[in-house]
């Protein structure tokens, strides 16, 4: 039976940084059932005290010491949170002091700076990339001239979530093209993709996993039949090999890893927002 541990991601901003780092840490441990809670915009003493009370209550409820992954910049807020008795994991503390020494400069303790909308050009680039991903999802639009990348795969192999992640976190204009039965009759690229070979990246997936995903969407249909999944995946992989399209299996790969691999393979230099 898994051991329950309450985990809180506390931040003076969105909490994305704390949650991302915390999740990466927790995945290193098995045999635990982590009950997570993100507390965003804890940016004044009153909110910090409220957060502290919630953390203490969780410790009493589960009769175990809570874990807090904290990205609050203001140390006075961190001290209030520490009164909860939780294990405090400060996201920035291990790095700030060495950086201050190396740069011979004190940090600017700006609340919410990590995900603040500082650069309007960057903000609009992300919004435009998101709009592009939505309008070019599943082959809805096929004007690929402005695309940075075109993900190609059979249905339900992870194209859409990867495109959205690339747009939101990297400002990448990512389109995706679903391979149809007609496309898979040939081991050559569909005509509408042939002029964009350098933008293509293929996603594949284990047929058993694909069948599970499709079964949830359309139970007991031909679409979700295991033999259909095997045939489609095999045909897509032959096409990718014949056309020398870079390919990655999404079966045991996170969206973050898929996105990083796509960017590196296609030579797209983008910073994570």
From Swiss-Prot:
InterPro entries listed in its UniProt record: Kinase-pyrophosphorylase (IPR005177), PSRP (IPR026530)
Q: Name one Pfam family in it.
A: Kinase-PPPase
Instruction: Report a single Gene Ontology molecular function.
Output: ADP binding
Can you tell me which residues bind ADP? 153-160
Q: Which UniProt keywords apply?
A: Kinase, Nucleotide-binding, Serine/threonine-protein kinase, Transferase
Question: Where does the secretion signal sit in this chain?
Answer: none
Please state the Enzyme Commission number of this protein.
2.7.11.33, 2.7.4.28
Q: Which domain of life is it from?
A: Bacteria
* Record field: catalytic activity: [pyruvate, water dikinase] + ADP = [pyruvate, water dikinase]-phosphate + AMP + H(+); [pyruvate, water dikinase]-phosphate + phosphate + H(+) = [pyruvate, water dikinase] + diphosphate
As for what it does, the entry says:
Bifunctional serine/threonine kinase and phosphorylase involved in the regulation of the phosphoenolpyruvate synthase (PEPS) by catalyzing its phosphorylation/dephosphorylation.
Which PANTHER family is this protein grouped with? Answer: PYRUVATE, PHOSPHATE DIKINASE REGULATORY PROTEIN 1, CHLOROPLASTIC
Protein family = Belongs to the pyruvate, phosphate/water dikinase regulatory protein family. PSRP subfamily.
By what name is this protein known?
Putative phosphoenolpyruvate synthase regulatory protein
Protein's organism = Stenotrophomonas maltophilia (strain K279a)
């Amino acid at each position: 039976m898994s051991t329950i541990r309450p985990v809180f991601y506390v931040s003076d901003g969105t909490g994305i940084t704390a949650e991302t780092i915390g999740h990466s840490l927790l995945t290193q441990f098995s045999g635990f059932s982590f009950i997570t809670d993100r507390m965003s915009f804890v940016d004044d003493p009153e909110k910090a005290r409220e957060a502290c009370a919630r953390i203490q209550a969780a410790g009493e409820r589960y009769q175990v010491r809570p874990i807090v992954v904290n990205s609050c910049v203001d140390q006075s807020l961190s001290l209030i949170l520490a009164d909860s008795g939780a294990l405090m994991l400060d996201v920035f503390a291990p790095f700030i002091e060495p950086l201050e020494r190396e740069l011979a400069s004190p940090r600017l303790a700006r609340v919410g700076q990590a995900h603040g909308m500082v650069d309007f050009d960057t903000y609009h680039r992300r919004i435009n990339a998101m709009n592009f991903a939505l309008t070019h999802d599943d082959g809805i639009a096929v004007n690929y001239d402005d695309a940075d990348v075109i993900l190609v795969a059979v249905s339900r192999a992870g194209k859409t979530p990867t495109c959205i992640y690339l747009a939101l976190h990297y400002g990448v204009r990512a389109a995706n093209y679903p391979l149809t039965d007609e496309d898979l009759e040939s081991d050559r690229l569909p005509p509408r993709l042939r002029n964009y070979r350098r933008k293509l990246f293929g996603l594949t997936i284990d047929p058993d996993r694909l069948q599970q995903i499709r079964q949830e969407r359309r139970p007991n249909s031909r679409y979700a039949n295991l033999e259909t999944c095997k045939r489609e995946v095999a045909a897509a992989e032959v096409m990718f090999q014949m056309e020398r399209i870079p390919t990655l299996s999404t079966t045991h790969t996170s969206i973050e890893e898929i996105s990083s691999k796509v960017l590196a393979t296609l030579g797209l230099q983008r910073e994570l927002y």
